[in-house]
Amino acid sequence: GVRTSGWFSGRKRRRAQRHTRDALIKLAEGDHRQVEKLLSRDADHAADPLANYLLAAEAAQQRGDEIRANQHLERAAEVCADNQIPVEITRARILLARHEDHAARHCLDRLLEVAPRHPEVLRLAEQAYLNTGAWRALLDILPSMEKSQVTTEQHLQDLRQRAWLGMMNQAMAEQGSEGLKQWWKNQSRKTRQDTALQVAMVNHLIECNDPQMAQEIVLAGLKQQYDERLILLLPRINSPAPEQLEKVLRQQIRQHGATPLLNSTLGQMLMRQAEWQQAADVFLKALEQRPDTFDYAWLADCYDKTGRPEQAAKMRREGLLLTLRQNPDQ
């Protein structure tokens, strides 16, 4: 009797091996129905029943059979009671494929407690957190992602950026401009010194019609380092003290040289203070450095205000010709 049962189990083992081998070929061919059938048929006798059930679950999910996928997952959990990590990873992957993002996130939160540096857990958690807008949780796993080297430095940087912008938008949506300002004050100095975040914050404040704080952030940012993104924001701030911005711009010109951008921005600040002649001078300087349709239009306005209509008309013509040259098809 013992020999007979040994012969039977050996035969089943060999058949399971053959089925597993055939299943891998079908997997390469993309035939998920056959993959699932072959892997699950003698899974209990396979060399690694857990792997068979998990692959069968994924194959069933690939062809949209959620009931079979769940059955294979439950069976995998039974055959491998002492190590549930592979089962839960597969479960999370299947939930994400079904767009059940919150359930996947719950599953991954639990996995991160037991396997905080597991590359696949981190990769799936990134996906689940992005899909559910769990920005704080995403920020929290970035150090582990860095240590586990699951992605590039650039991708980590992009994720960090997205997470902070997501948190900023959340604060704005939930508590409006006051909540956003409070949120900003609560951040670390390092965060508040990130230029991309400063730019996003100022854009929000301009939208909320809070020029005072917008100006404070831009000026603090420029004090820390010169960045064209901050300079480009200045004309959009409806400043209660344009002379303060003018002073800062002149300082930037002394430090970094009179670039076309700095000249043009200074011209716009001078126009706000009705300093038409001074504004015309700096717009001219900017145009000597390079042609620009906006600068031609602003310079024409300055000439109008100082009683020089012919020169104003000439500048408008130059601006129009430039536009036509830049867009020949229109």
Annotate each language-model stretch with its function.
Residues 12-48, 55, 62-65, 90, ...:
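Alpha-helical segment of the N-proximal tetratricopeptide repeat
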Residues 32-33, 66-67, 101, 135, ...:
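TPR-repeat structural position
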Residues 51-55, 71, 85-90, 106, ...:
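Alpha-solenoid helical repeat scaffolds
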Residues 79, 113-114, 126-151, 215, ...:
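TPR/TPR-like (Sel1-like) alpha-helical repeat modules
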Residues 26, 60, 95, 125, ...:
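Residue at a conserved register position within TPR or TPR-like alpha-solenoid repeats
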Residues 57-61, 74-77, 84-93, 160-169, ...:
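Alpha-helical adaptor scaffolds
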